[in-house]
Amino acid sequence: RESKFLKGLRCTDKDTMEVVIQVLCGSVNKGLTAEIESLGSRAIGLSGADGGMIKAVRYSDDKELGFAGKVSSIQSDVIELALNNGYIPVISSVGYDIHGQAYNINADMVAGHIGAAVNSERVIFMTDVDGVFLDKDLPESLISELSVKKAEEMIDSGVIAGGMIPKVKSCMEALELGIKSAVIINGKKPEQLMAAALGEYAGTRFFEE
């Protein structure tokens, strides 16, 4: 069945939610964990249910979105325990409300909240393009630095659209949560990830005026 998106968010009915849990918390999570281990690092696969890590609520009253959710809080104990023992936590973006109902949450939104919960200085969002463009068909129109105010204007005007909206909003939210640096880079280019991790210029960096 073809996925339906609304404002960049996946519409998630009951049946789709079951598939999301099986795939994100199962095959994808364990596949990434195994791949990291194969490269010589220690990793542990986790989901929002573990230790009550990701508390969620319904994203909106829009019935089309169904079980699409948003983060209400992060319990970081399990994450910090993993990090303090030398493990890279691989976390699926499924959260649960106080009644145990699962919600499909945009992974970028979860990443920003987790970054803030563990006091990260920098959060890096990866996609399949080099960052935010004034014109997606013109590579030279890449915006290297973007203020929160300007980003909001670009969303309102439709320059930033589709799946880029939640990524940009996640960057904005990360800054609001106290993270010093939020960047969108091309995850297919290792050199961009290395540069962003070192605090060098890559992709689109967001800042508050």
Residue ranges and their predicted role:
Residues 1-192, 208-209:
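Nucleotide/pyrophosphate-binding catalytic subdomain
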Residues 198-209:
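Active-site loop ensemble at the mouth of alpha/beta enzyme cores that anchors a bound cofactor
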